[in-house]
């Protein structure tokens, strides 16, 4: 499974039309769900630190404009490290 396939599956299986979600929730599911953990790990590039990799994942969400749209607001939520940080909000189409 590619990273893009995993992200698309997470979106389609976890969010209903009209749901609003952030990139942190997708990253959490990608990294902690047994089904996607291997895909998450094998796509980490040695040239990227974890924050850069997570930004890369968040950017990949935007490629699925057939099923999500960016909301013009940013939200502050806990990231995978338990730290508050701003991130993109998405709406499921």
Predicted regions and their residues:
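Phospho-regulated, low-complexity intrinsically disordered regions of nuclear gene-regulatory
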Residues: 1-14, 24, 29-93
């Amino acid at each position: 499974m590619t990273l893009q396939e995993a992200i698309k599956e997470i979106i389609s299986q976890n969010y209903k039309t009209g749901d609003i979600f952030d990139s942190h929730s997708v990253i959490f599911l990608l990294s902690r769900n047994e089904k996607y953990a291997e895909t998450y790990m094998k796509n980490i590039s040695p040239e990227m630190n974890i924050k850069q990799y997570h930004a890369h994942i968040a950017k990949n969400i935007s490629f699925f404009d057939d099923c999500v749209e960016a909301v013009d607001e940013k939200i502050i939520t806990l990231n995978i490290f338990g730290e508050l940080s701003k991130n993109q909000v998405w709406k499921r189409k």
